[in-house]
Every structure is written in structure tokens, then in C-alpha cells.
Amino acid sequence: MKDRLTINQTTKPELLPNNPILSVQDLGRIVEQRWIWSHLSFQLFPGERVAVIGASGSGKSLLLRALAGLDPVQAGQIVFQGQAINSHFMPSYRSQIIYLQQRPALWEGTVEENLQQVYRLAVHRHLIYNRKLILDYLLLLHKTPDFLQRPVSALSGGEAQIVAFLRALQLSPAILLLDEPTASLDTGTAQSLEALVAAWQYERPQRAYLWTSHDPNQLERITNRQITLKEKD
């Protein structure tokens, strides 16, 4: 038995360009000699906000990790802005695609040191830390500037996730891959992060994201299309 992709798509908004920012073509993933999904094809257009839904075990996280270049696939290809992803193109691709998960991994030090540290990575060395942008984001989150001086070791789970979001969004990715990023957070913090992502997309409306969540109310608020992973005979 194979898990195949069933796609429920609404008509994409008229203002969106005709060219997809990301194309998934006949993608397949095998785990323990079993196809988790196969013949998986869909497109992501600039400005889209897409929910990835499906039962537990349908491979939602595996899909996002594969799209981020973190996990292998056994069939098909991923095309970003017309360029097929391969080992040569991967560093450039990873500078444009950022994966956020439920439990972030942070470096030791203060919040601001975490935000600055990412610019030392090879794929982001061409960028410059923008403190004003971070302060604008903190204002949206109802956080004061002294939050930047907090030691990471003293942060709550919700505050750590805020740092992870800030660290990702400041890099101005073309696509965000959000894997249950607010699942363990209280409603207020979750909705603040939703607003932060909305502000990030408003800055450049061609940005797009894929978001997984077990909360249908959240997905109704933050997405305009669904991709559904279902098991098929």
C-alpha cells in the first residue's frame, strides 16, 4: 500500500504571478522499506499561504524537511524558481528556504547574540544584522528592547520560539516551512507569532509559506489553500 498525495486546491488569487516559486514533481520518500508518499506533485505560488494537513503518520513533517533539503527523497525532484535542486544549488536554496519546528534549537548566550550568530553561517554572510527590523518585530509582539539582552537559558518555551521566529524572519527567506511551530504554545503567544508571520509576508507579498498544524481553527485563520496527505490503495 502506498500513501499518495491528494491535493485540495482553491483557485489561486488573481494577483499572484503565473510562475510558481516552488514545484514538487513526482516526489517519493521511503522509510523502513515503505513508501510514506509517492507521486507527490504540487506547486507553490508567490504570496500563497498553504496548509499541509493529514493524519498522524502521513508524512507532513517528512515533506517539509525534504523541501528544506534536510531529508532525502527516493524519487522525483524539487524545483525552486525554475532551478532543479541538486547538491551544487543546495547552499543557495537553503539561504532562501527556512524550516521552523515545534522545539527550536538555540545557541548559548543572549537573545541578540542568537540573532547575530546566524549571520556567521556561510549561506547568510552576505546579509547584515538589522536591529531596527528586530525592534519593529518586538513591538508587534509587545516585547520591549531589553528582551534582546535576556539569556537564552532563562527563556520560557514560548519565548524561545519567539527567538526562533525572529532569527528566521530577519533573514528574509522566500519561503517559510512551518512544522507545528506553535503546537506547545499558549493561545496568545501562538496568535502573536501568526501576526508576526503575516507582517513578514506583508513586507514582501511574493513571500510564501507552508504550515502544518493539528488546529483547524488556526489553519483557517492563516492559510488560503490546503494540501492534504491521505493514504490511498
Per-region residue spans from a language model:
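Conserved ABC transporter NBD signature motif
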Residues: G76-A84, Y93
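Q-loop/switch helix immediately C-terminal to the Walker
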Residues: R103, G109-H126, L133
